[in-house]
């Protein structure tokens, strides 16, 4: 007889490797950056989903200084703490969070218009 190697079918878990890589803290938690239209040309940018151990007031202070806009931290019952900034600052906030090392680029979701 010839030497044939026969593969025995076994159970395959396609998510086994993915789950092993995602063991880091907050890897699947997305940061949502939204813009809301106010009256006329005025708009409001909201940032939600940052880790709870971050100091929201310090992040807000740096964002306000960097983008020359006003802002506040709002406590929401469902969403937790949400950062609100005046104007459409979606791109600015996303690049700021990535450069500061607070969030990975893959974990940012930008919504609006």
From Swiss-Prot:
N-acetylserine modification, residue list: 2
Coiled-coil residues: none
GO CC terms in record: cytosol; nucleus
Gene3D superfamilies assigned to the protein according to its UniProt record, in alphabetical order: SUI1-like domain
Listed Pfam families: SUI1
Family named by the database record: Belongs to the SUI1 family.
Protein name: Protein translation factor SUI1 homolog 2
